[in-house]
């Protein structure tokens, strides 16, 4: 073994190794997975990232490393894991296999899963860093001696009773609703009575207004009737005066005509029925009412 190591470290072997690396054109991995359009190249870059991840995980198992080196290595491994996920999505877009569904889980050298959830995990000696263990400790016991319940434990007690689907079975809700129902019925009855009183008050006010209007109309009709009677009396007086004058003038003629009437026995008969004064008054009163009715209805 010592002889082989000496051969590897010899000047000629190192020269040949350097010459071989210079002859090869090293390809750099694209910064973004979308820049690669070949499925073969995408698979190659994914395998390269896997090699770097395994190399980093084996290196981070060394407990002799200082804290800063361990943190840098752990950050670099998480970065490579995220980059591997980008290349796996790109391979799936190019028509390749779904490596995310087929790939096995990552384990430490001890065969344990790394601590952490989501996109950041702690590998190897990073678990023993200060402050990391406290993040993943079990919840402490409360003052009553019981462990602090998680959200999943709380959801176990959520059932139909929690949502109130079986509140009617104990009968307490019916008693409360019965009291409230009685109160609601009383309130509705009082409101109905109040509405009826208001309607009755409105109807009485309308009836009183109609009575006032009718009384005003009757008073006006009586005044008009009195005026008509006064006019009729004046006309009758004028007619009486004229008749007296005519009677004095016609007395002489009547005496002369009486003899002829006695001889001829003329009988006068009216073929047209003339209305009386009471009928004329009623007709005029009806016309006056009709005019007042039209006037109030228009207003």
From Swiss-Prot:
One of its GO terms (biological process) is mRNA 3'-splice site recognition. The keyword Nucleus applies. Keywords: mRNA processing, mRNA splicing, Nucleus, Spliceosome. It comes from the Eukaryota. One of its GO terms (cellular component) is post-mRNA release spliceosomal complex. Residues 239-252 have a biased composition (Low complexity). Residues 223-252 are annotated as: Disordered. Identified in the spliceosome. May play a role in pre-mRNA splicing. This is Pre-mRNA-splicing factor ISY1 homolog. It comes from Dictyostelium discoideum (Social amoeba).
């Amino acid at each position: 073994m010592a002889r082989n190591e000496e051969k590897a470290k010899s000047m000629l072997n190192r020269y040949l190794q350097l010459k071989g690396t210079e002859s090869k054109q090293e390809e750099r991995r694209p910064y973004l997975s979308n820049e690669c359009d070949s499925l073969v190249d995408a698979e190659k870059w994914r395998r390269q990232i896997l090699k770097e991840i395994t190399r980093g995980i084996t290196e981070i198992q060394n407990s002799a490393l200082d804290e800063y080196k361990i943190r840098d290595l752990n950050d670099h491994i998480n970065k490579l894991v995220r980059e591997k996920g980008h290349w796996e999505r790109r391979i799936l877009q190019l028509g390749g296999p779904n490596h995310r569904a087929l790939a096995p889980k990552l384990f430490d050298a001890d065969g344990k899963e790394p601590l952490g959830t989501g996109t950041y995990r702690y590998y190897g000696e990073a678990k023993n860093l200060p402050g990391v263990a406290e993040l993943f400790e079990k919840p402490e016991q409360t003052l009553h001696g019981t462990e602090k319940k998680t959200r999943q434990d709380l959801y176990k007690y959520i059932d139909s009773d929690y949502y109130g689907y079986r509140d009617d079975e104990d009968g307490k809700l019916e008693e409360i609703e019965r009291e409230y129902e009685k109160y609601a019925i009383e309130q509705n009855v009082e409101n109905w009575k109040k509405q009826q009183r208001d309607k009755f008050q409105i109807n009485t006010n309308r009836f009183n207004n109609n009575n006032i209007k009718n009384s005003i109309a009757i008073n006006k009709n009586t005044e008009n009737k009195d005026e008509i009677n006064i006019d009729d009396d004046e006309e009758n007086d004028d007619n009486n005066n004229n008749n007296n004058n005519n009677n004095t003038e016609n007395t002489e003629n009547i005496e002369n005509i009486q003899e002829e009437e006695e001889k001829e026995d003329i009988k006068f008969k009216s073929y047209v029925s003339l209305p009386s004064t009471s009928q004329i008054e009623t007709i005029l009163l009806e016309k006056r009412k009709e005019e007042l009715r039209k006037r109030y209805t228009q207003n």
